[in-house]
Amino acid sequence: MKTTEILIHQLMVMEGRSLEAYKDAAGVPTIGYGHTKGVRMGDRISERWAVELLKMDVQDVELQVKALDVARTEGQLDALVSFAFNLGITRLRDSDLLKLIRKGASKNAITQEFKRWVYAGGKKLRGLETRREWEAKRFFE
């Protein structure tokens, strides 16, 4: 099982694209479609490289999520990769969300837990609310 083009497209929409480095809502230097590793302010990239970085980043996160051994469908894998792509694998691994999934909690409980993760830099962000809604929906597809 692999992440889908649905996820790639959704990440492109959710992350937005910048061909020039900028600081994200949490103050982290970011470029392309949410790429942060090794980014310095002033960096610039091409659209083609932005897409390649996204695909490589998704592949890395996918391997980490698969190691948790909880995703049973493509929808679950897409949702959890999106979550970990945004927040980091450590936050997913240590989260109540993962605990709920592992114990087979109800759709409502899992959906509500996704929706708790909507803050960056101490601020509630509409973009994160939209993202968590998509992840919760995709998880159950």
Predicted regions and their residues:
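Long, amphipathic alpha-helical surface segments
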Residues: 1-28, 35-70, 90-141
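Mid-chain, well-packed structural core segment of small domains
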Residues: 74-96
